[in-house]
From Swiss-Prot:
The keyword Transcription regulation applies. GO terms for biological process: negative regulation of DNA-templated transcription. SUPFAM superfamilies: GAF domain-like (SSF55781), Winged helix' DNA-binding domain (SSF46785). PANTHER family: HEAT-INDUCIBLE TRANSCRIPTION REPRESSOR HRCA (PTHR34824:SF1). One of its GO terms (molecular function) is DNA binding. This is Heat-inducible transcription repressor HrcA. NCBIfam families: hrcA (TIGR00331). Keywords: Repressor, Stress response, Transcription, Transcription regulation. InterPro entries: GAF-like_dom_sf (IPR029016), HrcA (IPR002571), HrcA_C (IPR021153), WH-like_DNA-bd_sf (IPR036388), WH_DNA-bd_sf (IPR036390), WHTH_transcript_rep_HrcA_IDD (IPR023120).
Length: 354
C-alpha cells in the first residue's frame, strides 16, 4: 500500500486530522469524536467523525491506543503534519529577549551555552542541548613538574591565558634536567601553534633522531603528546538543561519511556552524533521518533539547528529533545532563533573564547 499524502485526503479528513494532531500536542491525550464535534470547523455528527477517524487510522496517520480512547497521531502522521500542515509561530519579543538575556559580551563560551540552553528549555518545555566542538588553543609554554618518582604534571599555557594540567605516568624515575629539557623542547616547537598542528612535526623529529633529546626526555615528550592528543579528540563541549521538563503528568503515565529517554540523555557522545547530522543542514532539522536511532526506544523527537560564526562557518548545534508531542510550530522557530543569536553573540568582539 502506497503511503498517503495530504493531496489524498478530502478537505474534511484533512481538517479532522489537523485537529487531532493539534489536540494531542496540546494535551498529550488521544482526541475523541465528541471533542472534535465541538469545533466550529467540523460540521459533522460524531458518527461521521468516527468514520473519518477510522479512515485516517487505516491510512496509517492515526492510532487508537485503546478501543474507546480516541485517536492520536502516528510518527508518520506527525511527519505529514510537520511537513505539510504546520504553521510556525515566530518567537514573541519577550521570548527573544529571554534567549538573548544571558548572552553578554565579556562572558565565556561555556556561560553562553548554559544561558542559551536554560532559556530554550524553559520556553520549549523540553530538554535543550547546545553543542560546540572543543576548541584547540594555541600554546605559548609547556613545562613538566615532578609529582613523584613515577608521575609528572604537564602544564600547558595557551595564548588566551588558559592553563591546563595533565598527569603523566612514567615507566621509571625521571630527573629534573630531563623534565626541563622536555619542557623547553616542546615550548620551542609548539609556541604559537595548536597541539594538532605541531604533534606530527615533533614525532617525526624524535623518530628521525633530530630532536637532540636524551632518551628519558624523548620518552616524556612522547607520553605527553599521547595524553594531550587523546584529550584533544574528546567529546565536544555540550550543555544539557531542562531534563525535569520531561517529567510532566502525561509522561509519568509511561514511566518506562521517560526512564529510557533520561538514560539516553546521559550519553553525551551519542547525542553529539545525533546533532552532527544537523551540522550539515542549511536549516533546522526535525527528527521524529524512530527517524533517529538514538531516541527510537523512548519514542522522542529532536529539533536541531546549526549555528554559524561571522564567516558563515558552522561551529555548533542547538536543539530541543522531548516527546513526539512537542509543540513543533512553536519550538522550531525558537531553536532557529537561538542558533542565530548564539552565532551573533559568540562572534562579537569582547566575547571570551576561554
Amino acid at each position: 500500500m502506497t503511503a498517503p499524502t495530504l493531496t489524498d485526503l478530502t478537505d474534511r479528513a484533512r481538517e479532522i486530522f489537523r485537529l487531532v494532531v493539534e489536540g494531542y500536542i496540546a494535551s498529550g491525550h488521544p482526541v475523541g469524536s465528541k471533542a472534535l464535534a465541538g469545533h466550529g470547523s467540523v460540521n459533522l455528527s460524531p458518527a461521521s467523525i468516527r468514520s473519518v477517524l477510522q479512515e485516517l487510522q487505516d491510512a496509517g496517520l492515526l492510532a487508537a491506543p485503546h478501543t474507546s480512547a480516541g485517536r492520536m497521531p502516528t510518527e508518520f502522521g506527525l511527519r505529514l503534519f510537520v511537513d505539510g500542515i504546520m504553521q510556525v509561530a515566530e518567537p514573541s519579543a519577550a521570548e527573544r529577549a529571554q534567549i538573548e538575556r544571558g548572552l553578554v559580551a565579556g562572558g565565556t563560551i561555556e556561560s553562553a551555552l548554559a544561558a542559551a540552553s536554560t532559556a530554550l528549555s524553559e520556553l520549549s518545555a523540553g530538554a535543550a542541548v547546545v553543542m560546540v566542538p572543543k576548541r584547540e588553543p594555541r600554546l605559548v609554554q609547556i613545562s613538566f613538574v615532578p609529582l613523584s618518582p613515577l608521575r609528572a604534571l604537564a602544564v600547558l599555557v595557551s595564548e588566551d591565558g588558559g592553563i591546563e594540567n595533565r598527569v603523566i605516568d612514567l615507566p621509571e624515575p625521571v630527573g629534573p634536567s630531563a623534565l626541563e629539557q622536555a619542557g623547553n623542547y616542546l615550548t620551542s616547537r609548539l609556541h604559537g601553534r595548536t597541539l594538532g598542528e605541531a604533534a606530527g612535526v615533533v614525532r617525526a623529529e624524535i623518530a628521525g633522531g633530530r630532536s637532540a633529546l636524551d632518551e628519558a626526555s624523548a620518552d616524556l615528550v612522547q607520553r605527553g603528546l599521547v595524553v594531550w592528543t587523546q584529550d584533544a579528540t574528546a567529546r565536544p563541549v555540550m550543555v544539557v538543561r531542562g531534563q525535569a521538563n520531561l517529567l510532566d503528568e502525561t509522561a509519568l503515565q509511561d514511566i518506562e519511556r521517560v526512564r529510557q529517554l533520561l538514560e539516553e540523555l546521559e550519553g553525551a557522545e551519542a547525542i553529539a552524533r545525533v546533532l552532527d547530522a544537523a551540522r550539515e543542514a542549511q536549516a533546522t532539522r526535525i527528527f521524529i521518533g524512530s527517524e533517529n536511532r538514538l531516541f527510537s526506544l523512548s519514542g522522542s523527537s529532536v529539533i536541531a539547528s546549526p549555528w554559524r560564526d561571522g564567516d558563515g562557518r558552522v561551529v555548533g548545534v542547538v536543539g530541543v529533545i522531548g516527546p513526539t508531542r512537542l509543540n513543533y510550530a512553536r519550538v522550531v522557530p525558537m531553536v532557529d532563533f537561538t542558533a542565530q543569536t548564539l552565532g551573533k553573540f559568540i562572534g562579537q568582539d569582547g566575547f571570551s573564547r576561554k
